[in-house]
């Protein structure tokens, strides 16, 4: 996966048609709390441990959006509390528990990760892709963007869409409203766009 710093990138040009997908966020997801309380932190760690006891995968705590099939764009984001639950699940499955330093490292994170899967018909279609948030008419740029330099065959191969690729971005918490309705849009350099309507206030 290739990596790109996006400081200094200029205005984005929109190409082609828009694919807009909405998905109700799961009730098990964690709110986007930038400064969670001690009670919230402990609850997130306990939920991760409980998930491991039930043999549930760590990605249970991802906040998913977009399509649920294998041929349309989708994605997920990881909140701070969700990240704690993911870590606690991973470690509990190995008979361990997170240290204070590991918990602090997650809580001190300045950015939120957003991962998407998009589709195209060329193996390099995702190269130089870009992602933005839009909140109340304001475009919010990510700190970094990564993308698959070579896409994988989709479930439709050899029919269209032939390929799927990941585009992953990190957004600074200080740059966006964690309680606002948000449109997440991915722009492949080859044209087109995939948009996801996500109401951050509904993440609980």
Please place each PLM-identified region on the residue numbering:
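Prokaryotic Sec-type signal peptides and long signal-anchor helices
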Residues: 7, 17-19, 65, 204
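Short, intrinsically disordered, low-complexity terminal segments
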Residues: 10, 26-28
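Bacterial N-terminal signal peptides
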Residues: 16-26
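N-terminal secretory signal peptides that target proteins for export/translocation
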Residues: 1-11
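Conserved functional micro-motifs across diverse proteins
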Residues: 31-204
């Amino acid at each position: 996966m290739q990596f790109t710093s996006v400081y200094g990138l200029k205005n984005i040009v929109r190409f082609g048609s828009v694919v807009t997908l909405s998905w109700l966020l799961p009730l098990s997801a964690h709110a986007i709390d930038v400064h969670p309380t001690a009670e919230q932190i402990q609850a997130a760690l306990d939920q991760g441990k409980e998930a491991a006891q039930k043999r549930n995968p760590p990605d249970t705590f991802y906040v998913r959006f977009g399509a649920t099939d294998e041929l349309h764009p989708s994605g997920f984001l990881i909140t701070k509390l969700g990240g704690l639950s993911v870590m606690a699940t991973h470690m509990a499955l190995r008979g361990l528990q997170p240290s204070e330093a590991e918990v602090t490292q997650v809580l001190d994170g300045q950015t939120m990760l957003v991962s998407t899967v998009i589709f195209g018909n060329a193996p390099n279609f995702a190269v130089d892709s870009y992602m933005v948030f839009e909140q109340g008419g304001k475009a919010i740029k990510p700190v970094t963007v990564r993308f698959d330099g070579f896409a994988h065959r989709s479930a439709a191969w050899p029919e269209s869409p032939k390929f799927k690729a990941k585009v992953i971005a990190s957004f600074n918490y200080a740059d966006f409203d964690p309680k606002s309705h948000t449109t997440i849009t991915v722009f492949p350099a080859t044209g087109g766009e995939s948009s996801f309507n996500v109401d951050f206030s509904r993440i609980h």
